[in-house]
Amino acid sequence: LADALRHQRNGNYKQAIAAYLSILEHDPTPVEGRQARFHLAESYLLSGDYAAAAAAWESFLASYPEDPRLPRAALMAARAYRAIDQCEMAVPVLQRHVNSETVLADLAYEWIGDCHAGHQSFEEALAAYRAALDVSRVPDVEARLREKLASIYLDRGDYDTALAEYSAILRLALNEEYHARIEYEAGQVLAALDQPADAYARYHRVVESAPESEFAYPSLLALAEAGEKVDEFQAGLAFYYAGKANRDAYGAAIRAFDRYLAQEQVPKADEALYHKALAQQAMGRTPGALATLESIILEHPHSPWLEHAWYEKVVTLARTGSVGQAVQTYREMVGLFPDSDLAAEALWQVANLREGAGARAQAAVLYRDLQSGHPGFEHAGEALWRAGLIDYLAQDLDGAADAWQDLADTYVGSPFSAGALYWLGKLAGAGSSQPENEHWDQLVDQHPYDWYALRAAQIRSGTPLTGTRFVTEPLGPSHWEANEAEAQLLHWLAGWTDVPTSTVTAPADLTATLDQQPRLQRTRALLESGLREEAIAESERVLSAAWDDPLALGRLAFFFHGQDLYRLAARSAIRLAELWPEGRLNNAPQTLLRLAYPLAYTDLLSAEAQKRDLDPLLLAALIRQESLFEPSAESWAGARGLSQVMPATGRQLARHLGMEDYAEDDLYRPHVSVELGAYYLTTLLQVFDDQIPVALAAYNGGPGNTRRWLDAVAGDLDLFVETIAAEESRRFLRRVYEGYVIYETLYRGTEPSE
């Protein structure tokens, strides 16, 4: 049974199903038989074989009517029936068990309503949705239910009742975008009721209160079509924000602002001019944008938008290549706003633009000017770093050393000080195969787990950054003694928060109260019902509410970890370290580090590592950076699963591996994602001469780009890392390697220098 459960957890449902069937065929004990039947039905459902899942659940429900998991089983059975369009079977199952469901009763009623609505049984659907509302205590669920009620009333032509539902939704505390959508839809209902004045009032509210919303634009169009008079300033804002999705709207914004500015009373003339200039910039009308910004500067000397206008003028001039004018404008801006971070940001942008355009020497001067003029600016340390790197690439080693020494002396806590100390050490130890100097000693002391410290330690030890350093032995299961871990965390919290002494002496209190929290009860119930995405969404809301509460974050980190929600546990732990006055995760207790650097799916990591001669902890570090061990993770670019493989790459890798029945959704299955990720990393190591950092850069940025970056510096590894054109790829390789060493420290007991 343990093997079957492991296959199921790893997403290898075919193996899990075969294992459960084998158990049932070999005279299991009553307990084993019950467990095998329950998890067999689960596996069918998770695999997408809904007909088999429905049959398996029906058998389980009939065979074990007293099982405490029946409410969850009923939900999963109903989900299977609905997937094969058999609502006539789903509804009775839900109705039989809804009264025994204490946490997800609203969801059961909602699904009953969905089934009735799908079969045009509207009275039954309305009754089910109302029953769901009666038991729901979650605002988001209430809003969703009321939308479904409103939809039915609209389909039936009962606009007044639909409108009442929209009004009820608007009384809930929801985000601005959602509020704007409901307001807009309510306006459409009023228009259908032939109540144009009320409809227009709704549209006006959207335009005036939420001009950034995507529903401000259609509201504006509806008002314009009706010939309704609209505040031209608000119209300009709404058109401007709509321009991000519809470029033509920028032109409409400019015209609206012009009409506003032509009026006799223009109390927001400065703000209108500012957004007009931004719209002109977006349309490529640079001369017009500069003229508009100049109008703010000359005509509104006391405007709160004046500083922003100066900033935009500096950056706009720099974008056109008028660097001298941009710098002169910046100096005028500093004269007016000597302590302005926006002025510093303007010069920072100018320097970045010049460096990106290849004018590196000019950029280095600007970076130095920025740091000397604005030493407290958030990018001041990075400015010195970039100036030093530019000098180094130009063979001005003295200039580079000066910049990096200033950085190391002035910005000790800056993440860029580690790089400065590393390169100062390289300069000091030039020509020595075993550089030993105070810069590297200081680096290792101040930043022990930073890429640069690890690189220095690696050079000193003579250990190559290749696969020869891999330890390929299988990992043991990752576990800890919960009470001991909680006690350690509480003792640490007591040192810098107001955690009660009674809590510290009774570590069980850390998680004991969690079962009393309805939203966490709901999270657990959703997970037990196979609804992981819904559970994660619920947990995200809980985490958001606890974001600034150290004790709550500690509790949540343990709760999420215990529910295999590793990404949420890690985020809770990382946030807790951020709230700590020292603010350095690497100095936090080992318990917190283990929460922030989880180790899951060790059987998969070990199997793939041995098969491909990899280190399983390198795979763990890669997966942590990619997905924080969340199997359902999906990036904005479309990468999926634990290893964040792109669908196109996944298809190619699956062909190479002979996965005949591969489908894109398999990327969400841990055993597939880990295998593809390990195979891809192995391939890249082979392509790039077994160099770990280079292969990691290629994993993120692609082998073609990586080859160009490597060739541009003639294979110099340190310069390769510094000159990777894609910031994300540079950060990725560093973070994965840093994580690799942290994993070794946590789970192998080695030190960075070993």
Placement of each model-derived feature along the sequence:
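Acidic, polar-rich low-complexity tracts and alpha-helical solenoid repeat scaffolds
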Residues: 1-637, 643, 653-656, 662, ...
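Short loop-to-helix capping motifs
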Residues: 449, 690-691, 702
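Acidic/histidine metal-binding catalytic segments
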Residues: 615-621, 689-696
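A short, structured beta-strand-centered segment in the mid-to-C-terminal lobe
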Residues: 662-672
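Short, charged, surface-exposed loops that flank catalytic or proteolytic processing sites
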Residues: 665-666, 688-695, 715
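Gram-negative outer-membrane assembly/targeting C-terminal domains
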Residues: 723-726, 731-734, 739-754
